Amino acid sequence: KPQDRPNVAATLASLSIPLHLSTPEKFNPSQHPEFNQQRIELSPRSASSRIKGYTLSIGAKLVGITEINPLWIYAKRGEIFHENWDDWGREIELNHRYAVVFATEMAFELVGTAPHSSTTIASMANYAGGAFIATQLAAYIANLGYSASANHLRHYDAALVPLAVDAGLGETGRLGYLMTKDFGPRVRLGAVTTDLPLIPDNPVDIGVEDFCRICKKCARCCPSNSIPLDDQEAVNGTRRWKLNAETCFDYWGKVGTDCNICMRVCPWSHANTLPHKLIRALITRNRYSRKLFNLMDEIFYGKKPKPKSAPEWARYE
């Protein structure tokens, strides 16, 4: 729609990252930076601390480390960018043992407008920010003398949600996204795989599976019925709620955005105010709290919450 063009312009601008942050000879943000031949020796504990601290300092909200489960690695390259057709169908060979997985927070005021175009601005801004973080982190590890590969919007060697679960960032929710304690599903993920010896984090239990069994709000509100109302099922050696990706993506095409309705209505997606922080803390600890606050969420916000108005700068004229 013509009145939506300013938001489309902002969405596209969110993906406009510079090709070079310094001189081309100094730094070129590739997925596989050449590593320094003079390796800097670090203990796994020291390396893990430095890597996490650096990742948070350049914009990540959450970061964790895991040993890579081979099941999460994609078999072949399935997306083509910049007419690089030689890459299509190429087998992915990943010899890295560890993954550093991070999350960035999506803006609450933009996610709250889903499925309108302003929510896509938040998505693309986080994809671009994640690309920056992954690229810089991969370069940092390479400068230490180790092999590294940046995983972001334009390059994925592995499925990031199960990697993030293994790295202790959260649990997989009914809607198929990673559910984090502090932001719910309102995050975007990135990762760097590496052979730098690190100390893995442990998966966490924050009560997501139990809460999602009770809630089902994302499934009730999904306009394409892509999120199951049933229980988890066995899928490729895992047990999870199986999203219908085809009908979900088809609705994206119809609505012209990446929808995000499930993310908007999720009770874990509320702003990080003191009351909501307290509620999340109780939900992670007590099953009865999950039932109580699920009921309270429906009382205060409704069974099918309506989208909020976009910020003034992102509204239709």
Predicted stretch roles:
Residues K1-P70, Y74, G78, R264, ...:
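Iron-sulfur (Fe-S) cluster-binding modules
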Residues K52, K61-R285:
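Catalytic cores of enzyme domains
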